[in-house]
Amino acid sequence: METFVRLFKDSPQQRSDAWHAIRRTQVGGSDLASVLGLNPYKSYYIILAEKANLFKKNLNRAACSWGTLFERVSKDLLELFCQTTVIGDNIHIDGTYLGYPGHSNSPDGFCHLTLGYTQQSWEIKTIFNNVRYEATKRIPVLVEIKSPFNRKIKNSVPSYYMPQIQSGLALSPPISMGIYVEAMFRVCGIHQLGSNNETNTDIHPPESMLPLAWGIITICSTQEHTEAPQDFGTLDAETFRQLLETLYQKDQYTIHYSMPYETACPEMPNVVGYFGWKVFIFQIIPVMKHPQFLKDKYPIIQQFLRDLHTIKASPSPMETYEKICCSEESALSTEDIDNFTDMLT
């Protein structure tokens, strides 16, 4: 696994300008559900228009900021709960090296997990498993992390995330299993931190259970800031949403993370404010590699790339786009969609 990750050490770093530029010309892992017709929130034709630069992305900046903020926290918790180290969380894997030009994947990372065998099955070993296993083994896995702001967490992988995970597995030959990590975080004031269920109930519904962990996110200005820091964990819901939208402008702020279970605010210069977090659900769901996945679906990726090239090369891009939308039908059949549902079982 480590040798594989080192192959991409010089790839564009995730979320860098070079990375964004490449993704505008490729089908990335997170694009794949839309291209395959499996994303209920964004169709083939919407993402085609976005990549052809026919209109700006309709980004939910607050949700994007939330996901970015808590991706780092989720990695820290995964390392703690599974006694592992996540690597390769900033690389970009171009599919050209495996014969899939135009397709790429930017994984949330890779790590080794311990599987324990008990009652005729294997399970992922965590610090919460007080079990004497009959046997154990250590395996490398691909990591995919989600931390939804509002969506309810279920004990399964949403079908529209499965293509992203299978893409990462297909472009990572040494890896045969992925894990889908989904965490439910809640915001709290600094005074509410600790082993209790107190949270900011203006932002989130009340919680009845105790948290698995807690910590602090500190926001610093890139300019000199001398005002007293604010406890953002006590804001009302609308003001906190505005804060998340402001944090989307990453060049104005730097973000600092406490270690899990810390409750003391850090002393550092130019602190604008901080807020506490608690995690109440932290699911780790195994996903096995589907060997034929990318081979079977790559023709649809190629068709998308041809459509994209046709639009960009046209003297009348919007007119060409409209013709493509009117002339083509859905790229996937009902059987294809059923096959993806089967992967979840």
UniProtKB/Swiss-Prot annotation:
It is found in: Host cytoplasm. Plays a role in the negative regulation of host NF-kappa-B signaling pathway. Mechanistically, recruits host IKKA/CHUK and IKBKB to suppress their kinase activity towards NFKBIA. Keywords: Host cytoplasm, Host-virus interaction, Inhibition of host NF-kappa-B by virus. InterPro entries: NF-kappa-B_Signaling_Reg, PDDEXK-like_dom_sf, Restrct_endonuc-II-like, YqaJ_viral_recombinase. The keyword Transmembrane helix does not apply. This is Protein D345L. SUPFAM superfamilies: Restriction endonuclease-like. One of its GO terms (cellular component) is host cell cytoplasm. Belongs to the asfivirus D345L family. Interacts with IKKA/CHUK and IKBKB. It holds the Pfam family YqaJ. One of its GO terms (biological process) is symbiont-mediated suppression of host NF-kappaB cascade.
